[in-house]
Amino acid sequence: MRYGFTSLLALGLVAAAPAGAQAAGVTVSYNLDVGPLTVTEVKFTVSVAGGQAHGKARIRSAGMSRVFSEFGATAVGEARLGEASPEPVIYTITRDESDMRKVTTVRWDGGPPSYDPPLKKSDRKERLDAAIANGVVDPFTAVLRMGMAGDSPCPSTHQVFDGREVFELALFDKGAGKLDGDAAWKGAVQKCEVRWTPVAGRAKDKGVPGDSYDVAFAPVAELDDGRKLWLPVEMSGKLKGLGFRGFVTKVSD
């Protein structure tokens, strides 16, 4: 679950330019704090042009967490934009932990996505293939669909596939609010509860229970066609019993 959650957070916890700006390109840095420690740092770049959206997130362990596990990852996503919901094209994640590197790629070209490398366990692969046949998107496209849903990203439901796990993200409306803390985004937000539920893959097979998180979305940018782009600017909840908070620390064009 660690990477599944972190990759989604990395591709989603993005504050772009001030509201009303055109979403051409932006780089964002943020921290994920668990308890009193910053355990993960992320640098994220997103660009929107010519009917295509591209996102890249670099994730690495930070602070005392590096003593126990040297973890880093790069996630890259591409999606097609149009009048309907964004459609996934390709999603690649490269994970580095200690002296091991793993690369997983998912491609969409009509019908269910293909993924490489394949799963080794035949029974798990069978269940995973059945789940992705019902229609899934990658984490980057899921965030875009939340962000381009209209007047608010919630309520909505998304089936997400990162190449190894299929999980459901269900968003529920918790009303309007305002941020004025230490995050880079300050101002009005839409509060949502996000429920994460494993559908197929290792987490599902091992009986990992679902989780829920509080997320603050803001209309941080405006697309060329005038649509607002709602993106998460803060998240909080619990991971394995420890409280966490994700927040933007720096925004640059």
Predicted regions and their residues:
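Positively charged n-region of N-terminal signal peptides that target proteins for export
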Residues: 1-4
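Bacterial N-terminal signal peptides
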Residues: 6-16
